[in-house]
Design a protein with these regions (language model features):
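Short active-site oxyanion
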Residues: 1-2, 62-66, 190
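Hydrophobic/aromatic beta-strand patches that form the interior of the parallel beta-sheet core
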Residues: 41, 67, 86, 102, ...
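Active-site metal-binding loops of divalent metal-dependent hydrolases
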Residues: 24-26, 44-45, 71-72, 106, ...
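Short glycine-/acidic-enriched loop or helix-start segments at secondary-structure transitions
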Residues: 31-32, 50-53, 77-79, 134-135, ...
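Binuclear metal-ion centers of metallo-dependent hydrolases, dominated by the metallo-beta-lactamase
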Residues: 4-8, 78-94, 176-231
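Active-site metal-binding motif and surrounding structural segment of the metallo-beta-lactamase
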Residues: 26-74, 153-164
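A short, acidic, amphipathic alpha-helical segment used as a generic capping/interface helix at domain edges
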Residues: 148-153, 172-181
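Core dinuclear metal-dependent hydrolase active-site scaffold
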Residues: 1-35, 84-159, 223-231
Length: 231
């Protein structure tokens, strides 16, 4: 399996049978083989996770499939791509024989994706995160904690080969909560931080915290756009 960090929350995963492109909206993409199907995911409608530029990929990739969150308006899909597009709801499962994907409800907008392909389990959180904001109304934060933990509890006992999880420095001292909660429910072999707004040191900061002692060796430190890994 090959993984490439594109930008923000965008990653490309290449398995034996398919490409999976998550939350792409800008920056240069690697070259794709036309022999493999390309699955393009958009977790929600926010412009840092979805752009109509993804539909331009259809011109070069005849085996393309779009899996979009339910909150993205269907009218934003060009006519030429409608038959290649599926919309996914929380709790819904799509399975085409190559890829199986399940949706989980985000604590912000849209969904998170749990993908099964070639015997691999791949999780992309989108904006499903523990958005605990300093200075926010205490009851709002309490509700957020409850909502996030209840949703990831639905994944309890699962094993993920890779998990793409938000690690947002804008949350201040609470930036780590989403990942810290997640690993209590899911056994993730490798954790790729995302949504860190160019602050690449957030992974290192988390790895230095006592709470990460049990999983810090699974956190991948990202240093630049276009960086790749083979697993």
């Amino acid at each position: 399996m090959k993984i490439t960090y594109i930008h923000h929350s965008a990653f490309l995963v290449e398995t034996e049978s398919a490409y999976l492109l998550f939350d792409y909206f800008q920056r240069k993409l690697p070259e794709f083989s036309e022999e493999k199907p390309l699955y393009v995911f958009a977790s929600h409608r926010h412009p840092d996770h979805f752009s109509k530029v993804i539909f331009e990929l259809e011109e070069k990739h005849p085996k393309i499939h779009y899996i979009l969150a339910f909150d993205i308006w269907s009218k934003r899909v060009p006519e030429s791509c409608k038959e290649k597009t599926r919309f996914l709801n929380p709790g819904q499962i799509l399975d085409d024989g190559t890829l199986k994907v399940e949706g989980f409800k985000s604590t912000d907008e849209g969904i998170a994706f749990w993908c099964s392909v070639d015997g691999l389990e791949i999780y992309h959180a989108g904006d499903l995160n523990h958005w605990y904001w300093d200075g926010e109304d205490p009851q709002w934060n309490k509700n957020m904690t409850k909502a996030y933990r209840e949703e990831i509890a639905k994944m309890h006992g699962r094993k993920a080969d890779i998990a793409f999880l938000p690690l947002d420095p804008r949350l201040g001292e609470y930036f780590y909560l989403g990942i810290d909660d997640f690993v209590k429910e899911v056994d993730a072999k490798r954790i790729f931080p995302m949504h860190f707004w160019g602050e690449y040191d957030v992974a290192e900061r988390l790895k230095k915290m006592p709470c990460s002692a049990g999983y810090r060796d699974r956190i991948v430190e990202i240093h630049e756009e276009g960086e790749g890994w083979e697993i």
